Every structure is written in C-alpha cells, then in structure tokens.
From Swiss-Prot:
Keyword RNA-binding: yes
Gene name of the record: rplW
Family in the record: Belongs to the universal ribosomal protein uL23 family.
Function: One of the early assembly proteins it binds 23S rRNA. One of the proteins that surrounds the polypeptide exit tunnel on the outside of the ribosome. Forms the main docking site for trigger factor binding to the ribosome.
Pfam families: Ribosomal_L23 (PF00276)
Protein name in the entry: Large ribosomal subunit protein uL23
Annotated InterPro entries: Nucleotide-bd_a/b_plait_sf (IPR012677), Ribosomal_uL23-like (IPR013025), Ribosomal_uL23/eL15/eS24_sf (IPR012678), Ribosomal_uL23_CS (IPR001014)
GO molecular function, one term: structural constituent of ribosome
PANTHER family, alphabetized: 60S RIBOSOMAL PROTEIN L23A
C-alpha cells in the first residue's frame, strides 16, 4: 500500500522532549497527530511512512492553556499526541525528514 495524503495529514510532527527521549529507550516514539485520527489510522500511517511494525498505539489529548496578553485572554489549541510502540528490533530516526 502506498503512502497517501491522509497518512501525511495524520502524523504532524515528532515530539522531541526529555520524556519522549526516555521513552525511545523502551522502543516507543511520540508524535503530534491530527485531532480526528484514530489509533488504527495512526498505526497505519507510521507503518507506511517509516516502514516499521507497530505493536501498540496510546493516545492522549493535552488541553490548551489559557494565556493572557495585554489584558486580552486567549487560549492555545488542544494537542493530540500518540505514543507508538514499535516491534522488537525496529527503530525510527526522527531526525531525518519524511
């Protein structure tokens, strides 16, 4: 199956934080994903784009913070993240582009 535009729209960007780096030692990779993406869609997109085998996908939604700038109250957008567990022996180098 070839990568489609939906696969590229599903995976927005890798999350590069201290916690995500620690998870990479457990064969897990963290991505920002589209808010309407399901776990099955995320797994299919990662498998197709990176040519790896996905064993599990966990998702979470981080609620946007309320911020104030010069007395005007605004709100940051909610962000959906996916923690993707790869099969044993598989890895993704997230420093290379898609």
């Amino acid at each position: 199956m070839a990568a489609t535009a939906r696969h590229y729209d599903t995976i927005l960007s890798p999350v590069i934080t201290e916690k995500a780096t620690l998870l990479s030692e457990q064969n897990k990779v963290v991505f920002r994903v589209s808010a309407d993406a399901s776990k099955d869609e995320i797994a299919a997109a990662v498998e197709e784009l990176f040519k790896v085998k996905v064993t599990k996908v966990n998702t979470l939604v981080t609620k946007g913070k309320t911020k104030r700038f010069r007395g005007i109250i605004g709100r940051r957008s909610d962000v959906k993240k996916a923690i993707v567990t790869l099969a044993e022996g598989q890895s993704i180098d997230i420093t290379t582009g898609l």
